[in-house]
């Protein structure tokens, strides 16, 4: 277990960067290394989100609905992302009459950066993480929950009834599903015995079943598939994708909390949505799929990690294309009467199993 932890954890990225800088390991060198590390990780996530996310969304949706999708601009239609960016950023930023301007301006920033900051403690590969605090899992859920504040701000500050309804729906939905999400994560903590993200990954490094030619790793998706399925459903509800896109619901409340946003602010909200989807995929990969663990040397762990995130993302897009939207009352009832009860049952069952094993 110790060797696995050393292989998967490594030194945080800023510590490695400090060794390459001429400033030494003093306050200046540490600060510069932290900024460079954050820029590298942030750029990786923003690139995957801004370019690959929307393009893959269109392609996957087209495949499920027997259409061609984007195929005109550039190879495989990749240049459409640049065209979309130019189109959106060149539009006029229209401020709705009667808007609470400070809150209205701040909401898109909160939505985007609350997700981006969550990647700081995710171990993406050998040494590819900004920090590794002992309460890393608590940090991820705490920082991601700030998005609820951004949704309320966007809905309230827009001075629009549809925006306000979208914000209220978002809060009701997050309250109904963040509690089950956390309870399911606690069951993983009981198995791993730690809230530290790198140790949760390392705890899954041992083989669960050795069949000689092939060994099944002790990923918690195999150890506790019930919790894995529950977490995927709760995460789908948390990020607000079909069939749980109640805060937007175009056929009911126009575009929900983002109705009055345009230009660069709409881009930030759009990026924030994709960042939260990818952050959810990163958390699922870390808690249930062994993080960056996979066949081959530890140096290609980042490749396996991104592949697992994309697997979760493709499932999200499949759900968006295949499943109809639920009503708000159905969604809340499933959250409080279904997911909460099942997550509590999973937690009790996990505690009993861990107690017997111990």
Each language-model region and where it sits:
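Selective transmembrane helix interface/packing segments
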Residues: 2-358
């Amino acid at each position: 277990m110790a060797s696995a932890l050393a292989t998967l954890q490594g030194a945080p990225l800023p510590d490695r960067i400090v060794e390459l800088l001429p400033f030494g390991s003093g306050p200046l060198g540490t600060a510069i290394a932290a900024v460079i590390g954050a820029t590298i990780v942030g750029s990786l996530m923003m690139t995957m989100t801004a370019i690959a996310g929307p393009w893959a969304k269109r392609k996957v949706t087209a495949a499920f609905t027997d259409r061609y999708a984007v195929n005109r601009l550039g190879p495989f239609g990749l240049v459409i992302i640049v065209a979309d960016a130019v189109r959106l950023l060149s539009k006029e930023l229209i401020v709705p009459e009667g808007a609470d301007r400070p809150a209205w301006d701040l909401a898109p920033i909160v939505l985007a950066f609350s997700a981006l900051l969550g990647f700081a403690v995710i171990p993406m590969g050998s040494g590819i993480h900004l920090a590794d605090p002992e309460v890393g899992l608590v940090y991820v859920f705490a920082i991601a929950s700030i998005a609820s504040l951004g949704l309320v701000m966007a809905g309230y500050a827009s001075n629009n009834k549809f925006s306000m309804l979208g914000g209220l729906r978002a809060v009701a939905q997050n309250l109904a599903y963040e509690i089950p999400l956390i309870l399911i994560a606690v069951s993983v903590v009981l198995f791993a015995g730690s809230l530290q993200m790198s140790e949760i990954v390392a705890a899954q490094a041992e083989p669960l079943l050795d069949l000689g030619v092939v060994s099944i790793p002790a990923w918690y998706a195999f150890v506790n598939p019930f919790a894995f399925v529950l977490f995927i459903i709760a995460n789908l509800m948390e990020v607000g994708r079909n069939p749980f896109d109640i805060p937007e619901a175009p056929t009911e409340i126009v575009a929900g909390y983002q109705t009055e946003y345009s230009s660069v602010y709409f881009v930030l909200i759009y990026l924030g949505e994709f960042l939260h989807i990818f952050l959810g995929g990163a958390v699922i990969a870390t808690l249930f799929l062994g993080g960056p663990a996979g066949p081959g040397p530890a140096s290609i762990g980042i490749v396996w990690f991104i592949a697992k995130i994309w697997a979760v993302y493709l499932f999200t897009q499949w759900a968006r294309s295949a499943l109809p939207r639920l009503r708000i009352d159905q969604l809340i009832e499933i959250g409080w009467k279904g997911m909460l009860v099942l997550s509590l049952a999973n937690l009790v069952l996990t505690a009993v199993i861990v107690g017997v094993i111990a």
